[in-house]
Amino acid sequence: MNTTTLTQQHRTAAANPSLGTLTTAVGIYGAYFALAAIYFWFGGMKFTQYEAEGLVPLVSNSPLLGWVYELFSVRTFSSMLGVLEVSIGLLIAGRLLSPKLSLVGGALSAGLFVTTLSFMFSTPGVIEPSLGFPAISVAPGQFLLKDLGLLALSIFVAGHSLTRLETR
């Protein structure tokens, strides 16, 4: 199938949207909105003492990030992470202006979720000892596992944004 045929199909679908096409469009815009909202909320919470202290067991046991508390206080690191997360949210929301912004936001988001998923292997208490593997605790196990879905969503946002840039 050549590019002209794909373009014609896209125009036909846009002129005569089916329920599936409309549902997909709502899902795509919903994905951007949801991921940006999550970053604004989570990022904003990083400026609180409550959230800063909640990060300590995750970060301090991580071979990737365990060193940060030697350089920064718990509150400072949390605030820096908050700035990063709010910035990622702004970049993803920036899809309204340019797919270049959401491409960067999606890529940064994917990197952040790969990092947080690594905590599944370094944080004590992920496996529920009374049930054994593969049972995981509510916290931190299930709390961290949800990042697998957010990683997939981040990759989708980056890929969708890149596709939009390629088809301009």
Q: What name fits each language-model region?
A:
Residues 2-168:
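Membrane-interface extramembranous regions
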